[in-house]
Amino acid sequence: ASAATLLTGTTALSGLTTLGSMAASAASYDNYAKLLQYSMYFYDGNMCGSDVDTASQFSWRGSCHGSDEVDGGFHDAGDHVKFGLPAGYTASTLGWGYYEFKDSYDALGQTAHLQALTNRFCDFFKASTKLSGDTVTSFCYQVGVGQADHDVWCSPESQNDQSLRTAYWTSDDASDIAAEYAAALAVNYINFGNAEDLKYAKALYNYSIKTNKANCPEAANFYNSYDYYDDQAWAAGWLYLATNDSTYSSFLNKFMNDTNAGKSGQSGCKWGVYSTMCWNNVSLGAAILQSEITGDAMDWAKVTTYLNGKCTSESTYYCESDWGSARYNTALQMAALATTKYSAKSGMDYSSWCKAQMGMILGNNPKNVNFVVGMDSNSAKYPHHRAASGYQSFDEMKGKTDYSSNGHTL
């Protein structure tokens, strides 16, 4: 999504003729057109289900885990569990990128690929949800046993141990995950118009605000959400944009002006935003939606005050955490460039900072390494990814320092 924001930001500043120059050099630090295309291939590598052999754009990926209680969806990271919280966050953020910067996807012929990915996420969320009328009776928030799966090394196509594929359902918990599913479904409805997406989004949102709990140990051992309030506000923002129903904008407004503590002490955003976008906190995204909806200077000030404290140096890589640092960096870029899009109201333009940060990710760094796998000759190789590694067992991989000769470029 941040690739699309940068592409749009660059063309807005320099004119559409820059598209040709950006594609001219594979080693350039601003080849956002190629970056947008290549960044989405990760999801083709992570597809799960009985149709992967035809759905994935990678010929080396085959169908897998076809006996899962809930078929389809995507594996998490380089392993094979389907965790609900990061899946919902990912799908809603991909949808957000398209919502804000649709023209970039369209101009580059990438809309069909993006839509295939977000539809696949949403199809999985709907298949994970049991309805009675418009009411959620239960939903599946995880498929796969976290630690047991992490103790295995093999391709998904050869992982046949069904004892590792437990589906976890709840009828009165996981409010955070339900809200993330709802957000993803709502923005996908806005983007592509599937009425079933909106139906399920409303139902999952209502379930979330009714249950108000986030205490699922199977998920928390790997993705421990601090609260559910931010997820509900994020979903409410998208549902308002989808329906124009003031019930949703009222909830979002309450979150933006609330000080009441949530599950673990998280409050609303009355005093500002305090976290970069990530799977465990989407307050910044919710605050941007609120600001877009109201256009209010005080709402935008909460967003820009936070961003001004983070988007400071164009020569130092922004590192929120050294574990998966680029996810925080690019998520912050996404928020910053969405804010830049509305500069007439927000009063800020962060495009120069974002271009500098993305340049570092694309190789303008002391190591001269492009951290987007497969994009350039100097791209990072051998990520932690079981499907791509070429090794079929831990014993086969043990002691090796590179991918198998049967490995693939992710």
What is each of the regions a protein language model found here?
Residues 29-30, 77, 103-115, 194-195, ...:
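Short, surface-exposed loop/turn segments at secondary-structure junctions
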Residues 99-117, 161-169, 187-200:
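Short coil/linker segments at helix-helix boundaries
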Residues 117-132:
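Carboxylate/His-rich catalytic cores and anion/metal-binding grooves
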